[in-house]
Regions:
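Glycine-rich hexapeptide-repeat left-handed beta-helix
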Residues: 2-118
């Protein structure tokens, strides 16, 4: 495994073979990180959880629960922790939130008008 500068690893942690951890990562105690994992800079991992083999954690992600499936995980900003693919969908939807709100308001107005016409 490769560790960058400023990496803090708590008590009783296990880091799997062939994993890479970038700078300023914090891993709390009794966490198990699988083999062939990468953890991006500034990420934080709470204690007493397990991370499966072949997991890739994006920089500045806060991992707050165990990860049992391989893949890339992202939790940037105030969005909930999720798979990277789901995070990308969420980010795309957030960009269109104003449009969705306008459409919803239009539908609500139409429903109100239909109810008044009865």
């Amino acid at each position: 495994s490769k560790l960058d500068d400023q990496v803090m690893i708590g008590h009783n942690c296990r880091i799997g073979a062939h994993s890479a951890i970038a700078g300023c990562v914090g891993i709390a105690g009794s966490t198990k990180v699988g083999q062939r994992c990468t953890i991006g800079g500034g990420a934080g991992i709470v204690g007493h959880i397990e991370i499966a083999d072949d997991v890739h954690i994006s920089g500045f992600t806060l991992v707050s629960k165990s990860i049992s499936q391989p893949g890339t995980y992202t939790s940037i900003s105030s969005t909930p922790f999720t798979t990277h693919a789901d995070w990308l969908k969420l980010a795309a939807h957030l960009r269109h939130l104003d449009t969705y709100a306008e459409k919803l308001k239009t539908l609500q107005d139409k429903i109100k008008q239909l109810e008044q016409d009865k």
